[in-house]
Amino acid sequence: GIIPCGESCVFIPCITSVVGCSCKSKVCYKN
């Protein structure tokens, strides 16, 4: 992913995964 979703995933998974975001380097990115 290259677009930051404005969410971290250090302690919990990406809630924004419902819109296509995934965790990378402790930050949620959209592919």
Curated annotation (Swiss-Prot):
Disulfide bond annotation, renumbered to this chain: C5-C21, C9-C23, C14-C28
Pfam families (alphabetical): Cyclotide
Keyword presence, Oxidoreductase: no
Record's comment on post-translational modification: This is a cyclic peptide.
Cross-link (Cyclopeptide (Gly-Asn)): G1-N31
InterPro entries xref list: Cyclotide (IPR005535), Cyclotide_bracelet_CS (IPR012323), Cyclotide_sf (IPR036146)
Tree of life domain: Eukaryota
Assigned keywords, A-Z: Disulfide bond, Plant defense
Biological process according to GO: defense response
Family per record: Belongs to the cyclotide family. Bracelet subfamily.
Domain comment in the entry: The presence of a 'disulfide through disulfide knot' structurally defines this protein as a knottin.
Its biological purpose: Probably participates in a plant defense mechanism.
Protein's recorded name: Cyclotide vpub-B
Species the sequence originates in: Viola pubescens (Downy yellow violet)
